[in-house]
Amino acid sequence: MAAASVSAASDSQFSSVLAEPSRSNGNMVHHSSSPYVLYPPDKPFLNSDLRRSPNKPTFAYPESNSRAIFSALKNLQDKIRRLELERIRAEESVKTLSRETIEYKKVLDEQIQERENSKNEESKHNQELASQLVAAENKCNLLEKQLEYMRNMIKHAEMERTSVLEKQVSLERERQHDQSHVQSQLEKLDLLEQEYNRLTAMQALAEKKMQELESKLHEEEQERKRMQARAAELQSGIEANRLIFEDRNTSCVSTSTRKIKKKKSKPPEKKGFRNNFGAQPHYRLCLGDMPFVAGTSTSPSHAVVANVQHVLHLMKHHSRALCNDRVVNSVPLAKQACSRGSKSKKSVAPPSSSVNEELSDVLQTLQDEFGQMSFDHQQLTKLIQESPSEELKDNLECELEALVRRMEAKANQITKVRKYQAQLEKQSTDKQKELKGNKKTLDEEGNSSSRSSVITRTTSKKDFTKQRPGEKSRKNLQLLKDMQTLQNSLQSSNVCWDY
């Protein structure tokens, strides 16, 4: 009875030990024929009562967020600790079971004789315990393998995370580099567009400037031709003035002697004198009156350049400058002798006034050209300030230097013309003073009728020597030479202009 009670107690203890792991494992061992069941999806751990909602399943891979990864690592560490604790508990339970089995075997050995019938049942129970032990060992091995696999997965996830971060950094750098490259290309494109617009504006301005310069050159060519025509007219006018002045001097001397003779002679001679010279026909032009055209000269020769075609044109068109003084004035010689002073002033004054007008026109044209050059100087300075490239700036500075040199030459020409104008005015005032002196001497000779003819001849000779027509002609020729050199300089400067 005692043995039966001991066996019953041991059986109940063994059944309680077997029942505890069956509860802790969550009904994993259900029956000997089907010892395994499906793992519950809402229970992530084996030996814990932690539950998870079925709508939020568990994933083996970590999330992309670092916090989620760290939380997963913590959970894994907790799981590992729990598994270690469970493994220790399982080993302890196995040890206790082994001790119990040893004790049970001892009890069985002692009670072999008594419990021969229960031998098969005990062997069955032993086999079941052995199978349970093998299953527990297999589960432990499987858990160890899962733990190692999870460690490898964590390492692989860390490596993938670092590689992804490196790729993101490299992609960000490439994107920034591409953006900077595109920005630089856009800035270069903007600069090229601005340069193209500037070049088109400069080209349009240059074309406009070229058109203006072509029109200016055309106008200056016409002005040069006009100046040549004026210079030729001025040359012919000066020579005609010289001839008229010489003729006037000779006529003054002859009329002074004739007047004294008339006072001594009879009055009918005056009537015959009017009949001979009252109505003068048109003066037939003789080439002897134009020494610079025909090649002969009554005075010392001068290297005077003359436009023969212009002179022939004046001859064909009845130029009053080349006609005789009596025909030009259309007054008889008797009336001319009575009014010497007034007629001499009128005969000398128009050529000098025409010369002054020509010089003033030349001076005006030179001043206009100088003003245009100053305007071009301002335009060039503006272009130099606005020029984008250094090469264009250097070219414009060279043009500006050439323009400054031309302006200096033009200023010298203006000073020369003003000097010539002042010289001509001085000569005209000197001529007027000499004519006034001649008039006074002729009036004194007319009033002093008691003087002899010898005295009149000597006074007339003295007056003739005082006037010195040869020197005046030389001065006029010198002035003509200066005008021609000025004309040549104007032509050369007009031809050499380049912008």
UniProtKB/Swiss-Prot annotation:
Biased composition regions of type Low complexity, renumbered to the chain: 1-16, 448-458
Record key words, sorted: Coiled coil, Cytoplasm, Cytoskeleton, Microtubule, Nucleus, Phosphoprotein
Region (Mediates interaction with microtubules): 278-490
Biased composition (Basic and acidic residues): 427-443, 460-474
UniProt record, GO biological process: fibroblast growth factor receptor signaling pathway; protein homooligomerization; spermatid development
Claim: ATP-binding is one of the keywords in the record: no
Top-level division of the source organism's lineage: Eukaryota
Keyword Phosphoprotein: yes
GO molecular function terms listed in the Swiss-Prot or TrEMBL record: fibroblast growth factor binding; gamma-tubulin binding; microtubule binding; protein homodimerization activity
Residue segments, region centrosome localization domain (CLD): 58-239
Residues with the Phosphoserine modification: S53
Any coiled-coil regions, as ranges: 63-242, 388-491
Tissue: Ubiquitous (at protein level).
Subcellular location(s) of the protein: Nucleus; Cytoplasm; Cytoplasm, Cytoskeleton, Microtubule organizing center, Centrosome
UniProt main location, coarse: nucleus
Region Disordered: start-end pairs: 1-41, 255-275, 424-476
GO CC annotations, alphabetized: centriolar satellite; centrosome; cytoplasm; cytosol; Golgi apparatus; microtubule; nucleus
Residue spans of biased composition, Polar residues class: 22-35
Subunit organization: Homodimer and homooligomer. Interacts with FGF2 and RAP80. Does not interact with FGF1 or FGF2 isoform 24 kDa. Interacts with microtubules.
Family, as annotated: Belongs to the translokin family.
PANTHER family noted in UniProt: CENTROSOMAL PROTEIN OF 57 KDA, UNCHARACTERIZED DUF1167
Entry function: Centrosomal protein which may be required for microtubule attachment to centrosomes. May act by forming ring-like structures around microtubules. Mediates nuclear translocation and mitogenic activity of the internalized growth factor FGF2.
Domain text: The C-terminal region mediates the interaction with microtubules and is able to nucleate and bundles microtubules in vitro. The centrosome localization domain (CLD) region mediates the localization to centrosomes and homooligomerization.
Name the record gives this protein: Centrosomal protein of 57 kDa
Organism: Rattus norvegicus (Rat)
